Amino acid sequence: MSKKNLQYFMRSTQQEVVTVPGPESFKDEEGKVIDFEIKVLSQAEIMKINDMYRTHRPTRDKKGNPLVMNNEIVWETERDSARASRHLIVEALQYPDLKDPDLMKHYNCVDITEMPLRVFPRADEYQFVTRIVMQALGLMSDENADNAEIEDAKN
């Protein structure tokens, strides 16, 4: 048996940046689709952002008293997954930088989680950007690859 070497698990800490074509509605002076740059976030960063939009509080009865079951307080957890996913988009997109103060001022926006909705106001643009970012982060599978696998399985 070969010697176990932990060197294989010592990965580079440099962040990976993926370049993908943006939506058809964003073109440069020459009419070419603008490329978006997406930083691949670590699982720890993704979990930290998701935890920011999770609230944990005691469940209350109709009188406003905490609900107790088996001598323990029953906790209620609420998640704002839409806002968390918009925050993930902002953190992952390097170009366009949605946290840029000039861009935020242009859209009269003070909350970074509102920027994806302002910069990509059309539903098709927003869905496209959400899909490419989530695929780059590994949170969503590539539909084309899935369809190809299904076609291969059929044949």
Predicted regions and their residues:
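Short acidic, Pro/Gly- and aromatic-enriched capping/linker segments at domain boundaries
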Residues: M10-K27
